[in-house]
């Protein structure tokens, strides 16, 4: 799994990582702050952060002894753009199906 979108979607597949991204959408946070709502260890949160960082979904910086994480929007934009192509495809096909079914109903009358 080496292509960028696969790495992004793999990172997004985990509900804990999605919750971390939701929290980071509000602003930067430390590992301790990110761990507060979860019943998992700090090392487990750090592993989740490493996955998110590898996918480019977050960036991390160090100030003195604190290590903050922040959301990076570009990879989410890439995933959204990919999904948008398929949303349009299904919208168009379902609209055509709806029109076809309405024609069939009219023919039955």
Model-derived features: where do they sit?
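Short, hydrophobic-biased segments on the C-terminal half of alpha helices
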Residues: 49-50
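N-terminal helix-turn-helix DNA-binding core of bacterial DNA-binding proteins
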Residues: 3-43, 66-81
